[in-house]
Amino acid sequence: MKRRTARERAMQALYQMDITGELEPKVAVENTLDEGEETNEFLESLVVGFVDNKEEIDAAIRQNLKKWKLERISIVDRSILRVAVCEMKYMEEIPHNVTINEAIEIAKTFGDEESRRFINGVLSNIKDTL
């Protein structure tokens, strides 16, 4: 599984967990996989990394939102931001610009017309604080 695919699957897993409010991370990851597709370590580390550090990740996002509340952001955009911030804060071997570019590409696929600019702005602000 390519890293872009793993990031997309992680975003989808966080989306499911956000909607249901009670889905276990392992189940959410399994729900994103195609039939016969296996998970990988990167995907699982993104999802578990978010679950283990949810308060810190959400706080970093909240501190960099202008005129928005985290709860008012679309679930898709919130999930993309959470995956990207998890990667930026806890996977130091991945350059922040790569993470931001990947998040923008995922936003182009899954978000609305404003998503990519919004996500780019928030993540760029977070990058400056790390």
Curated annotation (Swiss-Prot):
Alphabetized Pfam families for the sequence: NusB
Coiled coil stretches, renumbered: none
Domain of life: Bacteria
Keyword Transcription regulation: yes
Keywords per UniProt: RNA-binding, Transcription, Transcription antitermination, Transcription regulation
Lipoprotein as UniProt keyword: no
GO biological process terms on file: DNA-templated transcription termination; transcription antitermination
GO CC, alphabetical: cytosol
InterPro entries recorded: NusB-like_sf (IPR035926), NusB_fam (IPR011605), NusB_RsmB_TIM44 (IPR006027)
A GO MF term: RNA binding
Family: Belongs to the NusB family.
Chain's role: Involved in transcription antitermination. Required for transcription of ribosomal RNA (rRNA) genes. Binds specifically to the boxA antiterminator sequence of the ribosomal RNA (rrn) operons.
PANTHER family: ANTITERMINATION NUSB DOMAIN-CONTAINING PROTEIN, N UTILIZATION SUBSTANCE PROTEIN B-RELATED
Protein name in the entry: Transcription antitermination protein NusB
Species name: Bacillus mycoides (strain KBAB4) (Bacillus weihenstephanensis)
